Swiss-Prot record:
Stimuli inducing this protein: Negatively autoregulated.
Family recorded in the similarity comment: Belongs to the LysR transcriptional regulatory family.
Gene designation per UniProt: crgA
Name the UniProt record assigns to this protein: HTH-type transcriptional regulator CrgA
Domain notes: Each subunit contains an N-terminal DNA-binding domain, connected via a long linker helix to a C-terminal regulatory domain.
Pfam family, one: LysR_substrate
Regulation: Activation and repression activities are enhanced by the addition of alpha-methylene-gamma-butyrolactone (MBL), an inducer of NADPH:quinone oxidoreductase.
Cross-referenced InterPro entries: CrgA-like_PBP2 (IPR048071), LysR_subst-bd (IPR005119), Tscrpt_reg_HTH_LysR (IPR000847), WH-like_DNA-bd_sf (IPR036388), WH_DNA-bd_sf (IPR036390), YafC/CrgA (IPR049755)
Amino acid sequence: MKTNSEELTVFVQVVESGSFSRAAEQLAMANSAVSRIVKRLEEKLGVNLLNRTTRQLSLTEEGAQYFRRAQRILQEMAAAETEMLAVHEIPQGVLSVDSAMPMVLHLLAPLAAKFNERYPHIRLSLVSSEGYINLIERKVDIALRAGELDDSGLRARHLFDSRFRVIASPEYLAKHGTPQSTEELAGHQCLGFTEPGSLNTWAVLDAQGNPYKISPHFTASSGEILRSLCLSGCGIVCLSDFLVDNDIAEGKLIPLLAEQTSDKTHPFNAVYYSDKAVNLRLRVFLDFLVEELGNNLCG
């Protein structure tokens, strides 16, 4: 005989609750019914899932293996049911989105009107933070971030890849000259980040093939500020291409050291806590970002 969802639900609840009585209370069932269902499940499987003592319950080796699988199955069933129910729902409510200012200005804000036209009942709240934040403490539903995840409690949806470019304004180059090698950057005014210091190691390689670390003449906490400084002729900067592509196309900024620039790309992700995965307004926003940014940005 095959197991059914009721047996999986009861077994998982017993394990998570730590006792038959607490599981029965949470499931609104009699203790005897809970015990009988778990026993029936064990008989179907032909193994003992639980070690029973008068003081506590514990999983057998087979029980631990089965519990992990049963838990995942129930989560997938719940997610599938939610998705089917959501087909007839209208995405609505407030969606709080956090990102560094350059991403807000150059990626999110230009798409806001289109998103609002498609989903008029979702109210976007755009917040700017330069560093990593605790999404729960800040009451943020989703954040856009560069780089890999270092929080195992987060999920990520890949949006696009970006390269870094070294650029300067025509005015700066006319006054100070154009560097022809990475080493010549030492004689120029380089613009860098206040923090983290790792962003001041640029994506250009020196004669030994190593990334070049600058000594900034000006520093700022935001890539958008550095872009403004660069546009005003204050110096040379290294920024992500999504931030400066339009300026380059319009002739406001000039790419430098193309042959020495690394081809390495950096992932940009939308990150959120895993328990937000079935939130309908979050899901449609993620799909929208992947559609728009994936189609319109290239690494």
